[in-house]
Swiss-Prot record:
Keyword Lyase tagged: yes
Gene it is expressed from: cpeS2
Sequence similarity: Belongs to the CpcS/CpeS biliprotein lyase family.
Expression induction: Induced by nitrogen starvation.
Taxonomy of the source species: Bacteria, Bacillati, Cyanobacteriota, Cyanophyceae, Nostocales
TM region(s), chain numbering: none
InterPro entries to which the protein is assigned, alphabetical: Calycin, CpcS/CpeS
Catalytic class of the enzyme: lyase
Protein name listed in UniProt: Putative phycocyanobilin lyase CpcS 2
One Gene Ontology MF term: lyase activity
Pfam families reported in the protein's UniProt record: CpeS
Documented EC number(s): 4.-.-.-
Length: 180
């Protein structure tokens, strides 16, 4: 049974490597957030750049230190994501920044969360090779996210944010690759 679990982990790890490599490039992200239950919407557009991070690189070593992982533990791969976002309805700059992702086993380590600047972890899995599902929990909230690669030029994302079992917000995204 132990070897089966190792095999499953190896499959997940090879899938996350491939998923991050296929996501490399510049993307235009259009998204809409729905606040529940009142339905208030917010429309955003972001320019996103994704860079693949190889095992052992400085960024992944720093990420492992932030998460207090043993020095003998190496994240298998990762991605650096930078963004610049604009509120479409208000026609003003909303945010810009970057975040690091690093994978080990079925855990995705991040240097910050969606709603916190503190390091967070997410459980991840692949229902199929082109769809990455994440579940992150912190500050009493649960973030469930699905990222789906559609061919080589498009991605869709959906995020559901819940607290105490009640859904608070849904984010839906369509992302178009600009440069690979």
């Amino acid at each position: 049974m132990k070897s089966l679990s190792k095999l499953v982990r190896t499959v997940d790890e090879s899938q996350i490597i491939e998923f991050f490599q296929e996501s490399v490039g510049e993307w235009c992200s259009q998204r809409r957030y729905y606040t529940l239950p009142d339905g208030e919407t917010k429309e955003m557009m972001s320019m996103i750049t994704i860079r693949f991070l190889e095992q052992g690189c400085d960024e992944l070593q720093k990420l492992a230190q932030i998460h207090k992982l043993a020095e003998s533990v190496f994240l298998i791969c990762g991605a650096e994501v930078t963004w610049c976002s604009t509120d479409v309805l208000k026609n003003r700059s909303e945010s810009e920044g970057s975040t690091l992702f690093g994978a080990l086993g079925n855990i995705l380590y991040r240097d910050r969360g969606f709603a916190t600047s503190k390091p967070v972890t997410a459980q991840y899995n692949f229902p199929n090779p082109k769809t990455l599902c994440l579940r992150t929990e912190y500050n009493g909230s649960v973030f469930e996210e699905e990222l789906k690669l559609i061919g080589s030029k498009y991605r869709t994302r959906q995020t559901i944010i819940s607290r105490a079992g009640e859904q608070l917000m849904i984010g839906q995204y369509i992302e178009k690759r600009i440069v690979q």
